[in-house]
């Protein structure tokens, strides 16, 4: 299961996050993507760690209460490192944790909260995915160029008779 691949579509990503905020049971398991149940279970198991990262008295919760979401989420989301599946799942779980614990007295309507969190988080995942793909493509092309350069050198040496190999000297 590759979370980056599964979350390529925004609507699928949104459904995963929405499903992961629900309590465990039949509805979450059968009405949402399978990854929603996995992420929801991670949130429930690691909630204590998430509270250590972002305690209840942290200024972040006050900003959410007052509706200042852009700067808050930008700072948290851009710091995410998504280089392996474990970190990707932890990122999804943390996003779900934020939604689950959004202050109930916030000026942000409940209907808008999901998209306020999902849009920047999904963008971050897409940027990470594209960057990883570009790096892999670049590494592959460098390896191919090195291989073809070595082959050309060998061919030139053979044609010129300058080879160190006693069979071709």
UniProtKB/Swiss-Prot annotation:
Family to which the UniProt record says this protein belongs: Belongs to the adenoviridae E1B 19 kDa protein family.
Keywords annotated in UniProt: Early protein, Host-virus interaction, Inhibition of host apoptosis by viral BCL2-like protein, Modulation of host cell apoptosis by virus
Keyword Transport attributed: no
Keyword Protease among UniProt keywords: no
GO BP, sorted A to Z: symbiont-mediated suppression of host apoptosis
Natural source organism: Canine adenovirus serotype 2 (strain Toronto A 26-61) (CAdV-2)
Taxonomic superkingdom: Viruses
Positions of transmembrane segments: none
InterPro entries documented for this protein: Adenovir_t-Ag_E1B_19kDa, Bcl2-like
Protein name: E1B protein, small T-antigen
């Amino acid at each position: 299961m590759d979370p980056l691949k599964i979350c390529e579509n925004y609507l699928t990503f949104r459904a995963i996050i929405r499903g992961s905020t629900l309590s465990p049971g039949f509805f979450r398991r059968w009405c949402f993507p399978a990854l929603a149940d996995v992420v929801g279970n991670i949130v429930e198991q690691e909630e204590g760690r998430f509270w250590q990262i972002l305690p209840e008295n942290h200024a972040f919760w006050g900003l959410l209460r007052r509706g200042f979401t852009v700067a808050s989420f930008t700072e948290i989301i851009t710091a995410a490192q998504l280089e392996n599946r474990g970190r990707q799942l932890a990122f999804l779980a943390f996003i779900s944790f934020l939604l689950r614990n959004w202050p109930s007295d916030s000026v942000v309507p409940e209907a808008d909260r999901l998209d306020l969190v999902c849009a920047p988080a999904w963008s971050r995942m897409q940027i990470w995915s594209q960057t990883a793909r570009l790096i892999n493509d670049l590494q592959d092309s460098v390896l191919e160029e090195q291989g073809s350069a070595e082959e050309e050198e060998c061919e030139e040496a053979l044609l010129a008779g300058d080879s160190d190999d006693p069979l071709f000297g």
